[in-house]
Amino acid sequence: MKKLKHSILSLLLLMGACIVSCSNDDGQTSSTDPDEVGGESFTIPVSSLRLRDPFILVDKKTSMYYLHFNNNLKIRVYKSKDLSTWKDEGYSFIAKTDFWGQQDFWAPDVYEYEGRYYLFATFSNAGVKRGTSILVSDSPKGPFTPLVNKAITPSGWMCLDG
């Protein structure tokens, strides 16, 4: 029960930090108090996160939390063991030049299904305003690739969240 309360409190703090920050920077921060797990340093405190449209995947296979968020026309991922300190894992998705969506990267959600990871996100281009795409990876941190190179929602629909 204590662990559940701690997780809920940490999640609330994370969401509060995300709402307050809403910045356009790259999300990079640093700390002088690293938390080491299995040789990895989790040095980014939740209170310093500056990001938009976060989604947290609880991955039972790796016993980690994965935080995906949009970041300057890319999707970035952090991971944590406790929701309090985080490690920057880089980008989970960087669109190639032939990817249909070239603007408005928005609200990624990630789910595990039958051993693979699926990222749902909203993108736009000149002909499709806010269409949803599904991306797939064998890892919760990516890299994700498009299942199909087009929006899965009708072009007349405005889909705000993947």
Question: Which sequence ranges carry the predicted segments?
Answer:
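Bacterial Sec-dependent N-terminal signal peptides
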Residues: 1-33
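Carbohydrate-active catalytic/glycan-binding domains of CAZyme proteins
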Residues: 22-162
